Amino acid sequence: MNKNELVSAVAEKAGLTKADAASAVDAVFETVQSELKNGGDIRLAGFGSFSVSRREASKGRNPSTGAEVDIPARNVPKFSAGKGLKDAVNS
C-alpha cells in the first residue's frame, strides 16, 4: 500500500473526502517526524512505538574498491510493533 492508497482507505473508512483524508495523513506523518526530530518518542497503545536510536560511527568498506570508509554516527528511526498489531497480523 502506498500513500495514495492509504489516503483512499482512510477516506472510505472515516467517511471523509480524499482531500480531508490526505490532510489528516500528512498531519500524522509531520507530527511523527517532528516529535522524533526533537528527540521524543510516540507510543500508540495496541499499535506500537516510534523512537530514535543513536547509531555510533563505524568503519565500512566500499564494495567496488574494497577501500575502508568512515561511516559517521547518526540517529535512526525505529518502530516497535505492539502486542495488538502483532496479534492482528497473526490472526
UniProtKB/Swiss-Prot annotation:
MF term (GO), any: structural constituent of chromatin
Keywords: DNA condensation, DNA-binding
Pfam families: Bac_DNA_binding (PF00216)
SUPFAM superfamilies recorded: IHF-like DNA-binding proteins
Any one biological process term the GO annotation gives: chromosome condensation
GO cellular component: cytosol
InterPro entries for this protein: Hist_DNA-bd (IPR000119), Histone-like_DNA-bd_CS (IPR020816), IHF-like_DNA-bd_dom_sf (IPR010992)
Keyword Metal-binding: no
Function: Histone-like DNA-binding protein which is capable of wrapping DNA to stabilize it, and thus to prevent its denaturation under extreme environmental conditions.
Family assignment from sequence similarity: Belongs to the bacterial histone-like protein family.
Name of the protein in its database record: DNA-binding protein HRL18
Organism of provenance: Rhizobium leguminosarum
